[in-house]
Amino acid sequence: MAGVEEAASCGSHLNGDLDPDEREEGAASTAEEAAKKKKRKKKKSKGAATGQQEPDKEAGASVDEVTRQLERQALEEKEKDDDDEDGDGDGDGATGKKKKKKKKKRGPKVQTDPPSVPICDLYPNGVFPKGQECEYPPTQDGRTAAWRTTSEEKKALDQASEEIWNDFREAAEAHRQVRKYVMSWIKPGMTMIEICEKMEDCSRKLIKENGLNAGLAFPTGCSLNNCAAHYTPNAGDTTVLQYDDICKIDFGTHISGRIIDCAFTVTFNPKYDTLLKAVKDATNTGIKCAGIDVRLCDVGEAIQEVMESYEVEIDGKTYQVKPIRNLNGHSIGPYRIHAGKTVPIVKGGEATRMEEGEVYAIETFGSTGKGVVHDDMECSHYMKNFDVGHVPIRLPRTKHLLNVINENFGTLAFCRRWLDRLGESKYLMALKNLCDLGIVDPYPPLCDIKGSYTAQFEHTILLRPTCKEVVSRGDDY
């Protein structure tokens, strides 16, 4: 405390000894020095601030450069790999956002293995692959039909029905993919029920089953050996496919009632190869001969001539291949598998002519037996009569079954397994009642004599105004 008082008294004494002018000059010089000190401090602070800002600017510039490099790198990676849609995650937030915004469009879907992607999803533009387009055969007087392909009128008519043709093509593409899938796994030792259900499950997925708008056109036929057509297993059928069997796979798909009816024959023993070749050749001959204004009987005659030109040797015996004369091809209508006209596979049929815009199933059956089939075995195929009117029904169970048929199948064919699948039970008496009333028609298996072998090939053709399209044609047959 004493030291502070002495300094204060010394200061006051010194001030008291100065003149007033000297005091003013001292005060002015002190103020100038203080101002200079403040200026120096400000300069230092400005210099320090400037020194801090310059590194910040350099850091910002380096971040921007890194960002630009990352963006360039991301663009190069996208160009190299169009399928890569996600960012690496190493860049900053802004770069990540840009990558998300600039995602590449997804490429077209591809079919899975086993097939499960609907055909309509594989072709999102709604335009489906065409079948084999052929020029119509020349007329009897030698005139060609080449003019149809260039006629503006015929082109306009063809275009007017493009939506219809497109429905057939979608159903045909489903058929092609299903049968390709079937050939990859069908083998001896499988039960017929297993084969049919596996096929039908795949067909339902690819056709994108939707009530009466899209689905299966008729039950899967898998007729064996002497049985030529209309066999599919009922519940409880334990039949197993054998190495020496000859199996006709006949199944159909439809879009909006536009039916694809197409069949092929499966064998494992090469001894049947010539029989299959004969029937396939006969079917292709029928397709080649078919056309606008062609008589149905002329098609049948050409088919018979080709088929009977083949001989086959099976187990040491030689057979002439015979066309099954009471089985035919047929015209196809909307939701109607047999639309009224028949295409014979022997000579002497109807002289009715094929017409522009019609659709036909050209199918041939060859046999080593008598060449005639008869009803045999337990019935599995049924179809509502297309022309039946209102028929009064008394029994409630029968009424219920008819409602189920109308809602799920309409006038398309069905089988007992499909009724089981819908949860129906104890329906056999009701089904018999519907058959007795003529509302539903039964289609039992059709067989040649025991010990004979039968084969089948079939395609659906469109008689378009400009050309003939074998819409179900594939790489397989």
Curated annotation (Swiss-Prot):
Contains approximately 12 O-linked N-acetylglucosamine (GlcNAc) residues. O-glycosylation is required for EIF2S1 binding. The modification Phosphoserine is found at residues 45, 62. Residues 1-121 are annotated as: Disordered. The keyword Nucleotide-binding does not apply. One of its GO terms (cellular component) is cytoplasm. Binds 2 divalent metal cations per subunit. Has a high-affinity and a low affinity metal-binding site. The true nature of the physiological cofactor is under debate. The enzyme is active with cobalt, zinc, manganese or divalent iron ions. Most likely, methionine aminopeptidases function as mononuclear Fe(2+)-metalloproteases under physiological conditions, and the catalytically relevant metal-binding site has been assigned to the histidine-containing high-affinity site. InterPro entries: Creatinase/aminopeptidase-like (IPR036005), Met_Aminopeptidase_Type2 (IPR050247), Pept_M24 (IPR000994), Pept_M24_MAP (IPR001714), Pept_M24A_MAP2 (IPR002468), Pept_M24A_MAP2_BS (IPR018349), WH-like_DNA-bd_sf (IPR036388), WH_DNA-bd_sf (IPR036390). It is found in: Cytoplasm. Residues 36-46, 96-108 have a biased composition (Basic residues). It catalyses: Release of N-terminal amino acids, preferentially methionine, from peptides and arylamides. The keyword Acetylation applies. Binds EIF2S1 at low magnesium concentrations. Interacts strongly with the eIF-2 gamma-subunit EIF2S3. This is Methionine aminopeptidase 2. The lineage of its organism: Eukaryota, Metazoa, Chordata, Craniata, Vertebrata. The gene is METAP2.
